[in-house]
Structures are given as structure tokens and as C-alpha cells.
Amino acid sequence: MRKLVLFFIFTYFSALCIAQTYKYLGVEDGLSNRRVYAIQKGPKGYMWFLTHNGIDRYDGKNFKQYRLIDSEIEVNSMLNLSWLYVGTDGTLWEIGKKGRVFRYDAKHDRFQLVYKLPDEVVKGNPTPVSYGFIDSNNIVWLCNEEALYLYDTNSEKNTVIENHIGESITDIEQIDPEHYFIGTDVGVHHAELKDNVLNLSPCHWLDNLKMQVNELYFHKESRKLFIGTFQKGLYLYDMNIHQTIKLNAGLEDVSITRIKAFNDKEILIATDGAGVYKMNVDTYKCDPYIVADYNSYNAMNGNSIYDFYVDGDRIWMANYPIGITVRNNQYASYQWIKHSIGNKQSLVNDQVNAIIEDHEGDLWFATNNGISLYSTQTKQWHSFLSVFDSGNVTKNHVFISLCEVSPGIIWAGGYSSGIYQINKKQMKAEFFTPSTFSDSDIRPDKYIRSIMKDSAGNIWSGGYYNLKQIDFSRKNIRTYPGLNGITDIIEKDEKHMWIGTATGLYLLDKESGEFQYISMPIESFYINALYQSDNGLLYIGTSNSGLLIYDYENKSFEHFHKDNCPLISNNIYTILSDEDQSILLSTENSLTSYYPSEKVFHNWTKEQGLKSDHFNSASGVLRKNGNFILGSTDGAIEFHKDMMIPRNYKFQMIFSDLRVFYQTVYPGDEGSPLEVDIDETKVLKLKYNQNIFSLRISSINYDYPSLILYSWKLEGFYDGWSRPEKDCLIRFTNLSPGKYT
């Protein structure tokens, strides 16, 4: 019998991404229920959530739900879904108030019932367990007012000891292998568990504390016990001086739900109603850290935190009853500017087609419902030409271009509505026809896609039919026949203009009016945006052809698209720059930073918290204060130009679901080729007749999961790399006997 030896080699295609402070996970993302009670991270890196419906596993992209089965009956009531722990050996445990203990069986990818309280204990008592806990000795505690049921997960033996405390246990913190702090509904106790006997150790300072304890946290380095209560604030027991202190945390009117380490010197305190607080373990300085901001669309979205998990710079929160909220401390936040229904002190419409900053630093937004002006000094909004403005006579409210033609005078180019002139000082808008500057009959434009002011002070207007140069001060106008379908206009130098159109790129001589068509190495010639860097390179954002960089001196192009770089869209809508250190590109599903010196791309998508991610053509500006603002179909976003992402990122590739003849096989099962889990298998040996099989590949990544692509090859069978794909299911049918790598 010949044996088949397989090795799989995978290549990883990815892009670094900008993320945002908060990310929200709900049922629409795959979470089984918005009511989340506990969060853990498993040894492989999966995040595990205990919800009202059961247990969910999350890899950054996909959720998988697990059923808890007892004698072929699913136990999914709230009484069976209470605590989730990871043991010292990395095993995942679930404990319910009904007294059932489930262990995660990694080999078979399921939860297995390993112990439950005797029927006589459960009968007549819907919640026989007041608290479930697993200690560092891998002993599961099922705490009852009359007895403690201790299940040894190593020997699988159960021991029942009398509960000498005589109170309902609410929390346990382990000090060392034999000593514990035990919180109850009336106080805190110091106890020793030795030879299966629980003895209370008298402690005057603790025994005199009379309060309902919700949460205990023992800071081993400082030997301090932090005691979270129900509406009585936060207390501290210092084992070094044997004293109890009431801490001035200002949490007397809320319930403290969880206390965990944040770093070596700080702890985080979660509450049911006041968000998360941060406290220094030495000075006891306590400040609000994560608190709901209901005035922002992209900030913390709730204050009832049932549990949280500190995962490096990322904090996962069970935000009851909303779902999971993830805060990432690596990244700066951004401002999301949106329309608020019925509120005139907001953006007039969320479809933002153009943005400019005027000479006074105020912001103008062209939308599908008129123009919005935001005063940066007074923080006030004012709208023009919208359906909300009284006395407005225009029937068309869609505007797609803006330009400050002289201080305080704004031109707004419309869609089938010509140009309107807004006098900022007088707060008046009126229809304006630049053709009145000329004696010739100039055909009205269907739309005005681009209006800009060149270095000589001339105004350029580009529309469906015409390209016009307008001397606003002298009231002269000049047309350039032969150029139409204008999409963007920028100045090359004092003598030339770059003209982007629906049919390609042109270089125009201002004086002579002659223009040169620039042949581009792409099939789709529609240009969305142009930007010229200080070194003369022209960046061209196209529709469905990616990014072109044109070197005019050498008459050469550099072409970037989805198939040859980490760009995740070939539709480049807006191009802005931070003094050429980086080039910012907006697309229909991301923002992308391109770094010319390194020729690398970094993407920022909805997965990383970018709430508004479908951007509009030529809609953006770099402000004088160093902030970028970009317009989208869902408002505008503003962030500082220096906001960057770390270049160190983590992912873990997972091999799973080995199927032979279309049936999943597990280690140790009869006929299975696996001795250990497929993810831990180095050499896969198959019998000659096991030549129809498949294998699934996935990754654990919480920053950019949708940007991961997989490619594979099997030397000796398929020597070339497969086409990169987002999902990777490798199938083999009738593979010939032999050795493959």
C-alpha cells in the first residue's frame, strides 16, 4: 500500500489597514444574539462570546455558533449560559447556573458535557449554582448555599464539601494554590481550601464589610484586592497593611460588573450604566475611560458593560444589550459629519459631492439637497438652495462642484442647474450665468463637474459641453472648443492645464487653446480625479482601471490596480496629498494611502470602523489645520493627515475541516488519517483509496480579514500558484498515489 505525503504551502496577500477607535459587532454581522454575557480569547486566537443563544466563535470575519447538548437535548436557556473560562491549559469551559459543565473538544470542534449536578440537587431549584469558577488547579467550583461541588477536570472526580460560609457566593479570586477571596451577597471572606476542606481565615477588616459583592480582582504584584459592589462603590483590601479602604471612584450609584488588569499599573472597571473607568493601583486615581458619546456617530455606543477582554491594544466589550463593541487604542478617531433629521444645525444632506475650505477657514459642502456652510468659529451651520430654505425658488437642489472665486464669493456648480453664486457676507444665493460675460452664444452645460481657480486668478469651469476660462474681475470668458465631458481640472504650470474627461486625459495650452491627448495604457478612460505632485508626477484616478501615475518628462506610466497591488478597488474617486509624503485615495469601499517613497498601499475599510466608506468623485480637501475631509454617500469624514496605522500586524492561518470522500474526519476516529488536529498535522498520510478529499483554510485576523487572499500549489500535481481568492477550499479528486509537497 502506497502512502500519500502532503505538505501545503500558502502565500498570503494582504494590505495594511487604517482602523478606527470603535467597531461594532451585532446580529447583522453574524453574532447569535445581542445579549452577550462573557468574552474569552482561546489559545489559537479565536474570540469566544457567551450570548443569550449559546456560544459564538469569531475569527475576525466569520461567526460560528455552538450548541450545548445534554442527552440529545439542546440547553440554551439563560440558566445554562452563565460563565465562560479558559483554564490554565488553554481549555475552554462553560458553566451554567443549572449546574452543567461543558468542555470544548478541539479535536471534534464541539462542546461536550463533562459534569452536571445530581438530579436531587437541581430538582425544585431552578438556579442551584450561585457562582461557577475554575481555579488554577483546574478545579471547577459549583457554588451552592449549602455545599460546594468541586469537579477535578484532570481526574474527572467530583468532591462535595460543606459551604461553611452559609451565604450565596457571587465571586471568587484565587490568591495562591490554596487560598482564596470569596465574595458573597453580604460581604467578603478569606478562605483556605486544603485536603478538600474549606476553612475560613478570620480577617477583621474583611469580615466587617457588609455589602453585596459583584466582582473581585486580586492584583498579585501589589497584593491588593479590589472589591466591586452593587451601588456601594469600590473598596480595597491591602494585604500588605491589612486594611480596607473605600476608594473615591464615584461609582456609588451603579453596579460594578467586571474588574481586570489593563497594564502593570492600571485596572479597568466596567459598570452597568457608567461605562468603563480606569484606575491606577498605586495612587487610586480613577477616571472615566470608555463612556458612551451619544453626540457622535462613531464613538462608544453604550454604558452597560457586562464583561470585557483586554487584548493588547484592543478591548472587546460585552455592551449589553447592543452586542460587541471593540475599541482599538492603536488608532486615532475621526469625526463623522452627518445630517440630523429635523436639525438645521447639521449637514443639510448626507450625499456630499464636493467640499472646499474658504479663505476664513470655514467649510462648504455641496450636496444633493443644496449647499451647507459650517463656521469653524461659531460652530454654526447655514444652508443654501435646499428644500428646507424658505424663499428658495430653484427646483434643482443637486450641486456637484464648489470654488471660492474671490474672498467671500462662492460658485456652486449644479447638475442640470448651471452655476449659483453665494455671497457669504450677505448670506444670499443667486443664479449666475458666466456666459453674460461674453457676446457669443455659449451652450448651457448639462452639469458643472469641476470649478477651480488657477495661479493667475482665472476661474476654470468644466461641464458636459464646455470648458471655459473666466476672468472674474474683468468679466471676460473664453471657451475651448473640442473639450467636453469634463470631470476634473488642475493646473500643470502657469502655461498649461491638465483636463480630465469622460474619454481620457488632455494637456491644454492656456494661451493658444491647443490641446494634446495623452494616450493611457488602460481600457477604461473615464477619469474621476487628478493630482499633480511637487515633482511633476500626475496621479490619475480612473473609473474601473485603478491608479495611473504619469511622468510627463519621460512620457511613461506606472499603473496600479487590484491585481498587482493591495488596492481593493479600481475606482479611484478623490486624490489628496499630505505634501507628497503620502497620497490619499478614496474609492467606493475604502480609503487608501499610497506612500511614493516605498511604493506601498495601506487600506482603511469598514471592517476597521470606517463607517462611511462609499466616497464621491473629486469630493475632498486638505484643510489648513492639517485635516483631511472627504465626502461620501453617507456624510463626510474628517481626520488628521498624520493619522497612521502600525505596520506590525498579526494573523494566524488555520487548517480545518479535512474531508475524505466528502465526510469530515477527526483525530482518533475509526479510519481517520489524523492522529492530531489537522491544524497541527505536519505530514498527512492517506491510503491509496483515500484520494478524494478536501481541506479548508482560514485566518484569524481582527483588522483586515476581507483583505486576505489565499493562493496554493501542490508540487508534483499542480506546480503553479492558484489564482488568489478570498475563500480557500482545496479539493482533490482521484489524486494519483505518490508523494506531494
Regions found by a protein language model. Name each.
Residues 1-23, 46, 91-93, 316:
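Bacterial Sec-dependent N-terminal signal peptides
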Residues 19-41, 47, 69-82, 120-125, ...:
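Residue-level "micro-hotspots" composed of small/polar
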Residues 41-44, 86-89, 134-137, 174-177, ...:
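Residue-level detector of Asp-centered blade-edge/turn motifs that repeat once per structural unit
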Residues 46-49, 91-93, 139-141, 179-182, ...:
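Conserved beta-propeller blade signature
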Residues 53-56, 98-101, 146-149, 185-189, ...:
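Loop/turn residues immediately N-terminal
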Residues 59-62, 105-109, 152-156, 192-196, ...:
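Short loop/turn segments that connect beta-strands within beta-propeller blades
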Residues 111-131, 445:
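Asp-box/WD-like beta-propeller blade repeats and closely related beta-sheet repeat scaffolds
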Residues 130-132, 141-149, 164-173, 180-187, ...:
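Solenoidal tandem-repeat scaffolds enriched in leucines and small polar residues
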